[in-house]
From Swiss-Prot:
Miscellaneous note of the record: The protein sequnce was determined following expression in E.coli.
Name of the featured protein: Type II methyltransferase M.BanIII
Catalytic activity: a 2'-deoxyadenosine in DNA + S-adenosyl-L-methionine = an N(6)-methyl-2'-deoxyadenosine in DNA + S-adenosyl-L-homocysteine + H(+)
Gene3D superfamilies: Vaccinia Virus protein VP39
Record-stated family: Belongs to the N(4)/N(6)-methyltransferase family.
Keyword Transferase: yes
InterPro entries, sorted: DNA_methylase_N6_adenine_CS (IPR002052), MethylTrfase_TaqI-like_dom (IPR011639), N4_N6_ade-DNA_methylase (IPR050953), SAM-dependent_MTases_sf (IPR029063), TaqI_C (IPR025931)
GO process annotations (BP): DNA restriction-modification system; methylation
Gene it is expressed from: banIIIM
GO molecular function: DNA binding; site-specific DNA-methyltransferase (adenine-specific) activity
Any Pfam family the entry gives: TaqI_C
Segment forming the signal sequence: none
Alphabetized UniProt keyword annotations: DNA-binding, Methyltransferase, Restriction system, S-adenosyl-L-methionine, Transferase
Length: 580
């Protein structure tokens, strides 16, 4: 029975199945075959190649095709997938190409792996199968919230996973167990582990278990129908986990380019897949879309907490120069916080409170102005906040944040009672032993009155802006306040530097986290590590002075452009780098 488009999308979300394009499969297979030839084992005994989530067999076909092209015809193909219909399709396609000896099995690969080391892929006479020589895979990517807490916890315990568990984490561990020491792997993953805090355990696992050959960050090329940005990991399983890799790993990084000054000097390239196979760097025009490509050596810091940096020698020297000339990072002088998350915005956030009947119109004392990513703009918010307000359920008593007893605000309580069923439906609130009417993630109300810097969590360009009107902050924004009270100067310095081309360039190189389409994720884990010059230095003081003029003296457009250019120049001087 054919699935409707809606049913297919639901299945993709639940299973994480996004089949690999043929050309991309060929690129991965060709790279693995080339590494096989380098290893010297390609012409000896039979080579077992496994795809543990083979779907309709695309990657197995690529592996066979690239092997034959390189005169390697001793690869035994092994495919597993829990989708029985996909296995039938894979069997048909392989047989159609004259491949009659492939071993295909319907089942969950994660259930087939013996974690004690006696690995068996099938329940028949192949139960004694040895680990494989080669793995080519596009394992399912299913986020924790879709996977479900129970299965996520089970997988975490079973495969000794830490942090937020996605399904491909478990596949990485299971595939590594199934791979021979010295065996090769080419696997498509999310690229999030390269730079995210949540990727620490994956970075550690890969670095400890593999000599990394190359990582290809596919960026926002949209080669798959899913929204997840992909990377391809190539590695050789270590013979000894205790030996640290000494040979440098390579990287290839491709992202859509939107800067007109760069696209006007682009080089025409016929196909995106052809571009992926090349080692060319620069800006390329493929079907009227522009892509920036860089290649170089992967930087793997000693600490797995730090992101893996994919930078050319020139880029690496540039950020190293900035780091060496910095005084501290933002987190050394300031606290960074996430905005409010109510988990029931339709109940708590409105611009129409005044239109409610008097008996359920909340008292003004509990209605607070709200600012969100909709107001985000460089320097100052786009508008003077507007009428959107939040019914705030917390107050500060004796220096502690506490839920309000709404008996003192009868109209607000009456309003909340009209939505009691909805609010009590948030079982996690009740499970956390909180009052049914509370917003999920509040902040200390005393902090709202403080001057602060805000920035949206996702934006195509930096939009750090100053707020001093005592607003509450929505959960789609982050905010910065000084650790030392009344130290507004440090806010002006941070505001100036964070909005420059220099910090945008630093962010792109050091944290490498572009989203679709050309948008950047401004998480606190990144922004907190922005470098700062000495706040007392002359260049810093000049930045602070011109920021005051920009914020409080309402300069005309011409003067505003002059100030922004001044800030760019002063930032370059403060960090000892050339003007971008």
């Amino acid at each position: 029975m054919e699935l409707t488009i809606e049913e297919m999308l639901i299945k993709q979300k639940e299973t994480g199945a996004h089949y690999t394009p043929t050309d991309l499969g060929d690129i991965i297979a060709k790279r693995l075959i080339n590494e096989l030839k380098k290893s010297g084992i390609s012409g000896t005994k039979k080579i077992r190649g496994l795809d543990p989530s083979c779907g309709d067999g695309e990657l197995l076909l690529s592996l066979n095709r690239m092997g034959k092209f390189n005169n390697i015809d001793n690869i035994e193909l092994i495919g597993i997938d829990e989708d029985k219909e996909a296995i039938k399709e894979a069997d048909f396609r392989l047989n159609e190409m004259g491949i009659n000896d492939a071993k295909l099995s319907g089942g969950d690969f994660l259930d087939m792996v013996d974690l004690e080391g006696n690995l068996s892929l099938f329940d028949d006479d192949l139960s004694k199968i040895e680990p494989v020589d080669l793995i080519i895979a596009n394992p399912p990517y299913v986020r924790t919230q879709v996977l479900g807490a129970d299965r996520a916890q089970k997988l975490a315990k079973l495969f000794n996973l830490k942090g937020r568990v996605d399904l491909y984490h478990a596949f990485l561990v299971a595939m590594t167990l199934q791979l021979k020491p010295g065996g090769l792997i080419g696997v498509i993953t999310s690229n999030k582990y390269l730079a995210n805090t949540t990727g620490e355990s994956i970075r550690q696992f890969l670095a400890e278990n593999y000599d990394i050959i190359e990582i290809m960050d596919l960026g926002d090329t949209k080669l798959f129908s899913g929204a997840v940005l992909q990377a391809i990991f190539f590695g050789t399983k270590k013979l000894n986990k205790g030996i640290r890799q000494t040979a440098p790993a390579n990287f290839y990084k491709i992202y859509e380019e939107t800067d007109p000054s760069k696209t006007e000097v682009s080089i025409k390239f016929e196909t995106l897949f052809g571009l992926l196979e090349s080692s060319n760097t620069g800006v390329f025009n493929v079907d009227e879309k522009f892509y920036s490509v860089s290649c170089g050596k992967l930087i793997v810091p000693d600490s797995f907490k730090e992101p893996w940096v994919m930078a050319t020698d020139e880029e690496y020297n540039w950020i190293t120069n900035i780091n060496n000339n910095s005084y501290c990072t933002i987190q050394d002088l300031c606290d960074l916080k996430v905005g409010i998350k109510t988990t029931a915005d339709k109940v708590f956030i409105k611009s129409t409170w005044e239109e409610l009947p008097d008996e359920i119109k909340p008292e003004v004392e509990v209605l607070k102005l709200l600012i969100s990513t909709d107001h985000a703009s460089k320097w100052r918010p786009l508008e003077r906040i507007g009428n959107q307000k939040i019914l705030y359920t917390h107050e500060n008593l004796n220096g502690k944040k506490k839920a309000i007893h709404f008996t003192q605000y009868p109209h607000a309580l009456a309003y909340l009672e009209t939505h009691r069923e909805t609010l009590e439906g948030r079982k996690y609130v009740i499970k956390a032993k909180r009052n049914w009417y509370q917003i999920w993630l509040p902040q200390n109300p005393d902090h709202w009155a403080l001057p602060k810097i805000l920035f949206p969590d996702i934006s195509p360009e930096p939009k750090f802006f100053y707020e001093d009107e005592g607003c509450c902050i929505d959960g789609n924004c982050y905010w910065i306040i000084p650790k030392e009270e009344n130290n507004n100067d440090i806010l002006f310095l941070i505001l100036g530097i964070s909005n420059t081309k220099y910090m945008t360039n630093y962010h792109d190189i050091a944290f490498n986290n572009k989203l679709y389409p050309g948008r950047t994720r401004y998480l606190t884990q990144y922004v907190s590590n922005y470098p700062l010059p000495n706040p007392e230095a002359n260049y810093s003081q000049e930045i602070i002075d011109v920021l005051r003029e920009l914020l409080f003296q309402n300069p005309n457009d011409e003067r505003k452009i002059e100030i922004e250019n001044q800030i760019e120049n002063l930032t370059a001087l403060a960090f000892g780098v050339e003007r971008l």
